[in-house]
């Protein structure tokens, strides 16, 4: 939905504090739908067709390396799943390498049906694609089976097509309970997690008392290991409920899970390396994004894994020299869910318009996303870390109707000194000022455009200015949520 089709009441949504109360900022929650206003002026283009890819599309798809990756460049929610779904048609294997059910990827099949995936790789909609959940992923089996049931009820078979690493760690309900208790304990300093138990599960992994998928093959010792986790949680949190009955029920539940999961369990490290030797094409689907990386993100307001290029190797067990093209997915503006610094955040009417037009509510949590201008400083930082070969600019259509669009091109301090790089210091990030470059917007509806040359001149100028500033070419441009709403440049 483009911006020009919206007008907002002075206070269209009730306001609430963000989860962490970061700097006293406020966020809107869903309320009455925005009112429609005058229709858009359509750009003169031929109707889009999805029967055969264009020459530009074929060129881009066929030139990708044997092992390629798709990673987020902001704070998640960039639209990675859609690109993976499209690219997967040209790949033999699609793999997840890190994170868990905190990653929410919304994709659409050829009939326009919407699927919200959290653990299962987005390539599952392509019937000839093998999907892999790698050793770096943490797996919540109840959620995993729920996704599979939802897919199979819609005619999408997962049997024989979905492999789960025997080295991946199990995420239990207890991890989700601990996640919530930890957030309550932190009070006003809470991180604003998805409360999916990701952090506590990775914590057990690092302290070497977690359980892995392979432990499901040894139910004689499974109960004792799970008992250690439950007991530790009860000792740490007084409100954590734990007794022998709970342990027995959990063990019985996981006996059933073990039987159902067995056909999926695979030594995926061996599978991935054999696939490389067999010259199969492999696409890696990153969860979250670089600005949430445990090392490179806005720590501590980050995730617990490495959603950067380095996480591909550690999360799948493949060599760095195997990697080829890495595509960075970047929204045409910036969004963030939860707490943490956000230098280019828009707190007024324009931010509300972006949120409403872009339907900016989290796939995993439903929380309203904070919105702001595209942050070039942060984007360049992500490009340096990951070595992107190209970018996928998404949701360009959402900016339609804005008379002026801004790019945050540099940071400076109160005394006027330029900050040369993206800082680790959160206090500095909170106080930092942003220098903006303003570009003219466009009024035309671009959602049906499939040829780059048919975009309004000002839209092309926006894309090309981003390329100039970050030094990375934009090869893919999203102009709508549908699978076909993509321009190959």
UniProtKB/Swiss-Prot annotation:
| A GO biological-process term | 'de novo' AMP biosynthetic process
Q: Report the cofactors.
A: Mg(2+)
GO cellular component terms, A-Z: chloroplast; cytoplasm
Q: One Pfam match, by short name?
A: Adenylsucc_synt
* EC top class named in words: ligase
Pathway membership of this protein? Purine metabolism; AMP biosynthesis via de novo pathway; AMP from IMP: step 1/2
Any idea where this protein resides?
Plastid, Chloroplast
Which GO molecular function, any one, fits this protein according to its record?
GTP binding
Binding-site positions, IMP: 77-80, 102-105, 194, 208, 288, 303, 367
What are the protein's UniProt keywords? Chloroplast, GTP-binding, Ligase, Magnesium, Metal-binding, Nucleotide-binding, Plastid, Purine biosynthesis, Transit peptide
* Co-factor note (free text): Binds 1 Mg(2+) ion per subunit.
Q: What does this protein do?
A: Plays an important role in the de novo pathway and in the salvage pathway of purine nucleotide biosynthesis. Catalyzes the first committed step in the biosynthesis of AMP from IMP.
HAMAP family for this protein: Adenylosucc_synth
Query: So what family is this one in?
Result: Belongs to the adenylosuccinate synthetase family.
Q: What is this protein called?
A: Adenylosuccinate synthetase 2, chloroplastic
UniProt source species: Sorghum bicolor
Name of the coding gene? PURA2
């Amino acid at each position: 939905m483009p911006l020009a089709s919206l007008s907002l009441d002075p206070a269209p949504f009730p306001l609430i504090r963000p989860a962490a109360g970061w700097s006293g900022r406020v966020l809107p929650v869903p309320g009455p739908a925005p009112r429609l206003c005058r229709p858009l002026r359509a750009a003169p283009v031929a109707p889009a067709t999805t029967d055969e890819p264009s020459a530009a599309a074929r060129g881009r798809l066929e030139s990708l390396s044997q092992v390629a990756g798709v990673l987020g460049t902001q704070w998640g929610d960039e639209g990675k799943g859609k690109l993976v779904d499209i690219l997967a048609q040209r790949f033999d294997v699609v793999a997840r390498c890190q994170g868990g059910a905190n990653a929410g990827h919304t994709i659409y099949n050829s009939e326009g049906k919407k699927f919200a995936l959290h653990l299962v790789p987005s390539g599952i909609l392509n019937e000839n694609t093998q999907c892999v959940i790698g050793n770096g992923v943490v797996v919540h089996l109840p959620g995993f089976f729920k996704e599979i049931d939802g897919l199979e009820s819609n005619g999408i078979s997962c049997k024989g097509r979905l492999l789960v690493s025997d080295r991946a760690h199990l995420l239990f309900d207890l991890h989700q309970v601990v996640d919530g208790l930890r957030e309550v304990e932190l009070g006003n300093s809470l991180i604003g997690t998805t409360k999916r138990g990701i952090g506590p599960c990775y914590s057990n992994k690092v302290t070497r008392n977690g359980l892995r998928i392979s432990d499901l093959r040894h139910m004689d010792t499974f109960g004792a290991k799970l008992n250690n986790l439950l007991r530790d949680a009860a000792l740490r949190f007084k409100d954590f409920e734990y007794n022998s009955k709970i342990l027995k029920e959990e063990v019985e539940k996981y006996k059933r899970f073990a039987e159902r999961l067995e056909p999926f369990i695979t030594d995926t490290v061996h599978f991935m390396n054999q696939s490389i030797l067999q010259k199969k094409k492999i696409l890696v689907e990153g969860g979250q994004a670089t600005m949430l990386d445990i090392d490179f993100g806005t720590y501590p307001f980050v995730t617990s894994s490495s959603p950067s290029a380095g996480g591909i190797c550690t999360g799948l067990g493949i060599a760095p020299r195997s990697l080829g093209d890495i595509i960075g997915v970047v929204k045409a503006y910036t969004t963030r869910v939860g707490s943490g610094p956000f230098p280019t955040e828009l707190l007024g009417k324009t931010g509300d318009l972006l949120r409403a037009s872009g339907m900016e509510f989290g796939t995993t949590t439903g929380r309203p996303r904070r919105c702001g201008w595209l942050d070039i400083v942060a984007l360049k930082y992500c490009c340096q870390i990951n070595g992107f070969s190209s970018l996928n600019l998404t949701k360009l259509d959402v900016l339609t109707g804005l008379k002026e669009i801004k790019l945050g091109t540099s940071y400076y301090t109160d005394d006027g000194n330029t900050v040369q790089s993206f800082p680790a210091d959160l206090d500095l990030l909170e106080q930092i000022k942003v220098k903006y470059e303003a570009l003219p917007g466009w009024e035309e509806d671009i959602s049906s455009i499939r040829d780059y040359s048919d975009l309004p001149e000002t839209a092309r100028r926006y894309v090309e200015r981003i390329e100039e500033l970050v030094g990375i070419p934009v090869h893919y441009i999203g102009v709508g949520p549908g699978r076909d709403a993509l321009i190959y440049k």
